[in-house]
Amino acid sequence: MRTHYCGDVRSHDVGTTVTLFGWVDRRRDHGGVIFLDLRDRSGVVQIVSDPERTPNSYAKAEQLRNEYVVKVTGRVSARPEESLNPRLPTGEVEIYADQIELLNAVRKQLPFQVSTTESESVREDLRLKYRYLDLRRETMAANLQLRHQVVKAMRRYLEDEQNFVEIETPVLTRSTPEGARDYLVPSRVNPGEWFALPQSPQLFKQLLMVAGYDRYYQIARCFRDEDLRADRQPEFTQLDMEMSFMSQEEILELNEALVCHIFKQVKGIELPRPFPRLTYAEAMDRYGSDKPDTRFGLELVNVSDLMKDSGFKVFSGAVASGGLVKVLPIPNGNDLISNVRIKPGGDLFKEATDAGAKGLAYIRVREGGEIDTIGAIKDNLTEAQKAELLQRTGAKPGHLLLFGAGTAAIVNKTLDRLRQVLGRELNLIDPAKINLLWIVEFPMFEWNADEKRLEALHHPFTAPYPEDVQDLKTAQAQAYDLVYNGFEVGGGSLRIYQTELQKQVFETIGLSPEEAQNKFGFLLEAFEYGTPPHGGIAYGLDRLVMLLAGEESIRDVIAFPKTQQARCLLTSAPAEVDLRQLKELHVASTSQPKVNG
């Protein structure tokens, strides 16, 4: 029977006999004495097999190789002074093995080295194909342990400190496509009808408020069929919360306390409160993003009013058509950024055009306040405009000014992208710094140019401010996002809880009364039976753990993630299914079957 995990043996165990189970991380033979590093999910401890002191185990120790599974029973001893290993929590002790039992061997060559001492870089596709081996590695074990600690801290705080109740909501529900595409599941017993996997528990948690469960939470699995990137997965996990009879201020205060509790429990960090707040308008104006990384400066400057009368048609034309002209000022940019990078073919020019810009205009500030740029800008700014530009941007000799001109969406996306790239490149970001802030006062709606209609910026169940109800199209939402070092880790709002207002919002986003009734009739009816005022929030657990772990991809904090092509390399999912299964589901495929060979 196991007495300890490998990583838990300490100096206070010296003199005791312990039984451990684990994998051979490394085997070394020093002058006839065999040293084994034994590993389990808790860490590594050193095992010693000496032919004189532990003859019963020595023959077995000679047979062992990396990743063999063994049981070890032995006596804990203090390491000699010269053998202490301060890098390991178990580095003050070693275990003299009285018995070693081989439980299983490795019968194939390992696709990569698992040992904690190996520093080789392993291709991600190989790691994902052999994920069960990758999860044995020290970094991945630490990440999953961190994830567990985060969830544990969430549960303990919400249940023990705030009287929340954990309630599960359905995974098979109906499709209500308003955002990303749904994953659909055919119903065998109801031919021609389909379930959808939930993109969030949004409607069910609101119904729980109607039912009187005024403080609900759930560690919820969610599904979205969308294009992937480093911090997205087709299936992901949320901490989902909903509360009745609470104001926005009370919800924000409770959630700040929750986040501070998580940081204290899992990282030992005391976060200052209250968290800073920016309105959506302020964030977009200063940073070009509603999830700004505020660990560094490089704030944007709006010069639209200054450029509307300039002779440079790109700038004046952008303003005349309702767009913006903004500047990203870069101190010492003249020395740090060459012309090659900001002209066509350069990497920064490409960043701008990839964001939708038609080009990248710039000004270099020289000694004496002289400006150096392409002739079209220089020749079409008056001396007064030049002076005002330098004054507003705080530009000094050596500054590089990068311009964005066009629609607000393109200008903000372009300069936000450049700001992030240059912030990292110029080492302006302290990786140890933690900046958390709330973004508040979002617009209720944004214009969808492709579909030529308004759509909800968050979702159509978000409540407007009461004073904005008379003109919903320009209303601000009682919504809030939590931003952590440039990543949105949580988002929520107060909800609509009156039937008529909910119908008006559906109408504003282009849903006819018939469509609204067909998709959301059950919710509208529920609102007729005494619905309390309520609001909530959801945290992206994967993204939060990624940031706490210092990783760059959420795939490194998920046990069995999908690739950016939404595939599981371990199981080869998704895969074709047997024709008989499709017939049972009354489903026919429009894709041509794959031809083997």
UniProtKB/Swiss-Prot annotation:
Site annotation (Important for tRNA non-discrimination) points to H30
Its domain of life reads: Bacteria
- Can you supply one Gene Ontology CC term for this chain's record? cytoplasm
Annotated residues that bind ATP are located at R224, D225, E226, Q233, E488, G540, L541, D542, R543
Q: Which SUPFAM superfamilies match?
A: Class II aaRS and biotin synthetases, GAD domain-like, Nucleic acid-binding proteins
* An example Gene Ontology molecular-function term: aspartate-tRNA ligase activity
Per UniProt, L-aspartate binds at E178, R224, H458, R495
- EC number(s) recorded for this UniProt protein: 6.1.1.23
List localization entries. Cytoplasm
* Entry keyword set: Aminoacyl-tRNA synthetase, ATP-binding, Cytoplasm, Ligase, Nucleotide-binding, Protein biosynthesis
Asked whether the UniProt record includes Transmembrane among its keywords, one would answer no
Q: Does the keyword Ligase apply?
A: yes
Top EC class, one word: ligase
Annotated GO biological processes are: aspartyl-tRNA aminoacylation
Region annotation Aspartate: where it falls in the sequence:
202-205
The catalytic activity, as recorded, is: tRNA(Asx) + L-aspartate + ATP = L-aspartyl-tRNA(Asx) + AMP + diphosphate
Subunit-structure text: Homodimer.
The record's function comment reads: Aspartyl-tRNA synthetase with relaxed tRNA specificity since it is able to aspartylate not only its cognate tRNA(Asp) but also tRNA(Asn). Reaction proceeds in two steps: L-aspartate is first activated by ATP to form Asp-AMP and then transferred to the acceptor end of tRNA(Asp/Asn).
Family in the record: Belongs to the class-II aminoacyl-tRNA synthetase family. Type 1 subfamily.
| Protein name per Swiss-Prot or TrEMBL | Aspartate--tRNA(Asp/Asn) ligase
Question: Which organism is this entry from?
Answer: Cyanothece sp. (strain PCC 7425 / ATCC 29141)
